[in-house]
Amino acid sequence: MKRRHLLASVCAAIALASGPALAQDKVTLKFGWTSSNGEKDPYGVGARIFKAKVEEYTKGSIEVQLYPNRAIGDERQMIEGMRFGTVDAGIITNAVIAQIEPAFQVNDMPFLYADEAKAHKVLDGKVGAELANRLAKKGVISLGWMEGGFRNMINNSKPVAAPDDVKGVKYRVMQNPVYIDMFSSLGGAAVPMAWGETFTAVQQGAVDGLEIPVAIVEANKYYEITKYLSMTNHTYSMIGLLISKRS
């Protein structure tokens, strides 16, 4: 689907989700995410385009207020807030979506997608539609899937050129059984941790490293506190553009 048609569909979905209030008053949507609002941060790029197009297509009747850097909570807090109507919308990593709808765990399986094109084909097809339907039953509407890129290992211990290189290294992982099992099975020490705690944990040596897309390494300055980046491309990072049913 072309971007213009997709965004038009998104705006229509928001209008329906916003209900009768749209006809009476200007609607304000608080839109959050946990990483930066940097020029190259994929979350920030997506959020800014979303804001611009929603306000354009609704002729200003919907205002999108942006809250980067965990301003309205970590991802788990945000998605739970969407379920209960205390958070309007945001960008949430697949692994965190899986905490409320376990079917999403399939996307985090290591080496499941060979490249972005194959991931797009699956997520834009029947599988993505079924995942969205399941999530809607939990009170959260998927407006679409965004590109997070492939995840890579970054640490202060050693480069990763083979599976054995993960042994004995403490990696911060997302609070998701797929990631915990992945690193544990390789002999690493998997340390589940919220994103907001991670930079300080790496900086202070509580963990040796983590695994994130290269764009997030750059946008959040992880290159300043780590020594080794290994292009493992072990998991495709799907991120969801989500809105509360109650918004």
What is the predicted function of each stretch?
Residues 19-23:
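Sec/Tat signal peptide C-region and signal peptidase I cleavage site
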Residues 4, 8-11, 24-118, 126-127, ...:
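N-terminal secretory/targeting leader peptides
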